[in-house]
Structure formats: structure tokens, C-alpha cells
Amino acid sequence: MTKRMITICVLAAMLLSCASCGSTETGNDETTKSGGTDTTVGDTTAEPTEYDKYPLPEKDMDGFNLRFCNYDDSWLTWTIKTLDVEEENGDKLNDAVYARNRRVEAKYNCQITEELVANPGNSMSGYIMSGDDLYDIIMVHDEAVSSLYCQGYLDSWDTLEFADTSRSWWDNNANEVFQIGGKQFAAVGDFTLSMVCRGFVMLFNKDMVSDLNLDESLYDMVRDNKWTLDGYASIAKNFVKDLNGDGTMDGNDQYATTGAVKLHFGSLVTGCGVKYISTDSEGVPQFAIPGNTYAFDVFEKIFNIHNGTNIFYNIVKADVHDGSNEATTFFKNKQTAFHGTSMRGVANFRDANFDIGILPYPKYDENQENYYILTSGGTVATIPVTLPEDRHENVGILLDALCRDSQQNLLPTYKEIVLKTKYARDEDSAEMLDIIFGSLTYDLGLSVWPQDTYYKYMESYLKMTDNFSSTTDKIKSIVEKDISDLVSSLDK
């Protein structure tokens, strides 16, 4: 018997034991006799939790196999994709995934399996066109999901009765974006860390910031609603230094930050609450930039902060995507005080020889209520149209069960152990992470059509040309066609 099967058997026995204990009769527990007088113990019943209010059915699935198709390690190395592991290996995240899956398997008498391929989206057409029933859930790169739906390969999530994506163990911010006209074509839940770890944050060198002797710490600026574009700019300019005194700012000098243009400037734009694609009152997407005075104010303010100031060093001038690896080296060499990275990328600085703090990207101004964290580039869950109807119930139950368990166990492991303890080096950064996790922001312009929206605006920052208005005019018809194609597919 394999270690996996032994674990499932032990967990199943424990679950049966707990159920037996829970149903044992205890007689008159609530009433006792004292001197001939009845004394009733006060009601100590706890308030029902969300889990209590929305229970899943108890069901013996008789070995049912929940089949995931996911990416192997040949691509998407920048995100955490793992949905199943064969055994524990001492890594806390690995072991949390293992324990979660074995608990769910034991509870429902089922199996959870994951087949890894180079690109699930690219290989989808062959087996779907032939009608093959190979997978229940296919994990897809967020940028590919609209195209796959428009080609008729994906089903709507309203076909899974028990996978209630409005519950807290699903990512409502993401699922609202992926729901159009009442139909949801992709979903994000706590069973996967892929999108969570793609939230972008701002790291800072605590020693370099401390040397400025600021009147208020960066953490307090976040708490006091003063971490704004103006606040960031006023601090960032102090780090620009011609280290070798040759009168030329280049790779030998010091800056506030550097990196991929799309990451730095995109995070600043999203941090101000700008959305490239919004929805109308009926849930239909619309291109949100044309005629949006606030969006243009944000674009131009960020442009003016950086134009000619050397706050940002454009280390790779070829395109908006490259520069992250070089930026990591600059930050470790103390040539930049700030560094933008995904939460997954925080792990790259375990060996840094200085203390690191973590911040959300700044707000537009103090009137902005919330922080917003750009989130894109991970995988989302999709349902193939080949999924037989008689599998829908079990698939929905098991997905929801995985999300519930992950909310209680996997996500806290990632937040508390992997991030707060292993990488973040102070309690203030741990508090910032709570703000960041609560501020993850999704946008069809970031996740589904970035090539036609988000990246186009980043070209202006790459070239440092203030042409946001002409860019909008140029891409308007393209974006509207993207939206029309997707909406038409949902109506079929």
C-alpha cells in the first residue's frame, strides 16, 4: 500500500471517529439537579459560520477521480501552479497541498489527480474537437481564456451547482471580472495560489530609506493614507545619485527603482484605481479609458513624475516586458531603494544582506479609499465543454471542498509561514501583506486582453512620450472587437 493510500485510510478512520463522537447521546447535559432545583446551563451556541450556513452534501463518491490538467515546469515558472503532490517532503507549502488533498479524498472517498502538460490551452483543441472526456478542470493562463471560450472549448461555471464562486473561499474580485452577463467563463478559488502569488508589491531597502531620516516611516504613510504618488515621488527623488561623478546616469549609478516597464508603471496605474475594462449595469464589459478624465490624469501624473527625473532607470529599452532579472541584481547591489515584484518573486531576496520591507503600490491621493494591487499572469480554472453532465455534481462538490479547506489551511500557510516568517523580516511588513492580500485587483485589460490594452499604454512609458490620447484612439476599435467577440460567444 502506498504512503498516499495509507494517509487516506488513516484520515478516513479519523473522520468516521469524529462523526461517531459527534453523534453520541450525553443524556441531560443541559440540565442538572441541585437541591431539588433545576439549573439550566446558559446557551453557549456559537454563531453559525459561513461554512455552517452553506454546507456541502455528505457523499461517498466510490473512488471518483477529480481530474485536473495543469502546466508542467516548462513554462509559467513565475507562478505557483501546484495542485497535487505525491508525498510530503518537508517543504511547508508542498506538505500543505498534500495534506489538503488527502483530507478531501478521505472525506469523499475520491481521488484527486493532476496531469501536467506543456500548455493545456494549446492542446485543448485536439481532444475537445474529438469529444474526448479527459479532464474535469483545465488550468489556463489568464491571457488565453477569452480565446478558448470564443472557440467554443469552455463551458460556463453556472453548470456546477455546488461550486458557489460567490463564497469567501473563492476569489470574488476575480470571479466578478470573469463573469459577463451572468455567465462565468473562468474562476479563481483558494484551491490554487497561482493568481494570489501574482499580486505585485513594492519592496524597499530599509537601510537606504532609514538614511533619509524621514519624518514618518513608509509603513505609517501607508496606515495614515499618505502613501500616494506625490508621497512616493518626494521620497524617490532622494535616491538618484551619480555615484561615479562622471556626469552621466547609467548602469553604474543609483536610482529609486528599475525593472520591467509594464510592472513598475502598470502597478502605479492600477494602484490609482484605473481599470482598462469595466462593466456596465448589466455586467457587459466596456473599454473604460475613452472619455475617462481621471484615467488620463493618472497616466499623465505618473508620466510627469518620471519624465527626466531618473527616478526609474529603464535598464532594458527593447520592450515593456524585460528588465526584472536586471532589476533584481540592481536591488541586491543597493543601486535602487525600491523594487517591484510579484509576491512569488519575494523569494528571490532570501539571501539579501540588508533588511527588506514590503509595501503596496501607492494611491493616487489621500482621497482614494483603498489600495489596489495589480494581479495578472497566473492560471485560472476552466471547464471543458466535454465534461459529462453526470460528473458535474461531484466536480462541483470537490472543487468547493478544496477551496474551503485551502482557505483554512493552505492560504494561511502561504501567508503566515512562507511570506511573513520566511521572507518578510518585520511585523510591519506582515501587516502590509494583510493589506496587500485584501487589495488584489483584477481587470480584463490586465488578465485577458493585456496585449491590446495594458501593454499598449505601457509603450508610452517605455518611450517616455505623452501619447496616451492617441494610443486610446488607435486601439479603441480593437478592444471593442475583443469585447464583442467574447460577449457573442457567451450568448451562444
Over which residues does each language-model region extend?
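Extracytoplasmic "Venus flytrap"/periplasmic binding protein-like
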Residues: K107-Q179, L212
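Extracytoplasmic/periplasmic substrate-recognition and gating elements
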Residues: R350-L419
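Glycine-centered hinge/linker elements that transmit conformational signals in sensory
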Residues: L229, A233-A236, L268-H321
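Periplasmic solute-binding protein
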Residues: Y149-G152, N173-Y219, T258-E282, S376-P384
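C-terminal capping/gating helix-and-loop segments adjacent to ligand/active sites or protein-protein/ligand interfaces
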Residues: P412-K492
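C-terminal motif of bacterial Sec signal peptides marking the signal peptidase cleavage site
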Residues: L16-S20
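Short, solvent-exposed loop/beta-turn-alpha elements that line the ligand-binding surface or hinge
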Residues: F162-W170, D224, D250, V274-D297, ...
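Short, well-ordered beta-strand elements
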Residues: D62-N94, C110-E114, I137, T257
